[in-house]
Amino acid sequence: MTYTLLRPLLFLLDAETAHTLTLDTLGLLQKTGLLPNRTIYCTPVRAMGLDFPNPVGLAAGLDKNGAYISALARLGFGFIEVGTVTPRPQPGNPRPRLFRVPQAEAITNRMGFNNVGIDKLIENVRQADYQGILGINIGKNADTPLQNAIDDYLICLRKAYPYASYVTVNISSPNTKQLRQLQNETELEQLLGALKTEQTRLSDQHGHYTPLAIKIAPDLESAQIEAIASLLLKHRMDAVIATNTTIARDGLEHLPHGDEPGGLSGAPLTERSTAVIRQLAMHLQQAIPIIGAGGIMSSLDAQAKIKAGASLVQVYSGLIYRGPALVSEITSLLCSRSTYAG
């Protein structure tokens, strides 16, 4: 009810200003003890060798710098993913770079991995009092040539490894030039090989295993999805997140901000991302868990992704349009046996 009243006021503001204001307010409420803790009980879901207290996670992008983990943890998520973070701080693309398309319940962003850098993010993670499952989403700096991208991912992996429950490798944002080329078979083969080798070394060094997930785009042909699935199996990756934002604009061109460059999320992405999950599930045959993301605006959207083959789901744009109550709404449905029984 509270968010229903607040949303029209927030939507009067520039989208990025509203985003920052909302997070700052949550952080203040948490620090002053005024933010209630929503504990949502569920049969734990086991994936990546981890026991998730419920299957609904926060997608990367909302808390890029890990500065609001303690506050977001009180909203009832089963896990939280922060980032995308890069080795060095970078400002991202010029503003405005975040746009709502309310008529389509969509958001377009061309943020460009704006973040404070991996060292500061880790400092924030260490200061948070969150004890739950935390994913750290890593990427490459905008000025790093594609041929050196592996180095950026390895730098971030090494620094995140001791503090993350799992690490997500973002190779699918449309807002960093050439990044999506890392999904091509040759480039992905090299990247996954380097990541697994380093993961093994870090596991020996730290005495524990931190899983690796790969986040892919929704704008892939069937043959590309099959090739990616084959490489994920070959390199024994721990999970795949499907999907990131889309560059498609089908039916939105006539709407205000509907044709803004960048990645589109929200309701127009729902079916596209679920279709990718379905194809991945067919190729992976439950050997690697799928985390479903993209256009989850209701509990039924989340259920559709589970039925398509996902083990867990993540939300972001749905929170902007529905508010925090969406988390408990989805969890209530997904925790019923019928969802996982098919």
Curated annotation (Swiss-Prot):
Pathway: Pyrimidine metabolism; UMP biosynthesis via de novo pathway; orotate from (S)-dihydroorotate (quinone route): step 1/1
Entry's Gene Ontology BP terms: 'de novo' pyrimidine nucleobase biosynthetic process; 'de novo' UMP biosynthetic process
Cell location: Cell membrane
Membrane association type: Peripheral membrane protein
Signal peptide segment: none
Chain residues that bind FMN: 60-64, 84, 137, 170, 215, 243, 266, 295, 316-317
Binding site for substrate: 64, 109-113, 170, 175, 244-245
Pfam families noted in UniProt: DHO_dh
Cofactor binding mode and count: Binds 1 FMN per subunit.
GO MF annotation: an example: dihydroorotate dehydrogenase (quinone) activity
Active site: 173 (nucleophile)
Catalysed reactions, semicolon-separated: (S)-dihydroorotate + a quinone = orotate + a quinol
Named cofactor requirement(s): FMN
GO cellular component: cytoplasm; plasma membrane
Enzyme class: oxidoreductase
Keyword Cytoplasm included in the entry's annotation: no
Keywords: Cell membrane, Flavoprotein, FMN, Membrane, Oxidoreductase, Pyrimidine biosynthesis
EC number: 1.3.5.2
Role description: Catalyzes the conversion of dihydroorotate to orotate with quinone as electron acceptor.
The protein's assembly and partners: Monomer.
UniProt record similarity statement: Belongs to the dihydroorotate dehydrogenase family. Type 2 subfamily.
PANTHER family named among the record's database cross-references: DIHYDROOROTATE DEHYDROGENASE (QUINONE), MITOCHONDRIAL, DIHYDROOROTATE DEHYDROGENASE (QUINONE), MITOCHONDRIAL-RELATED
HAMAP family, sorted: DHO_dh_type2 (MF_00225)
Protein name: Dihydroorotate dehydrogenase (quinone)
Organism: Nitrosomonas eutropha (strain DSM 101675 / C91 / Nm57)
Lineage: Bacteria, Pseudomonadati, Pseudomonadota, Betaproteobacteria, Nitrosomonadales
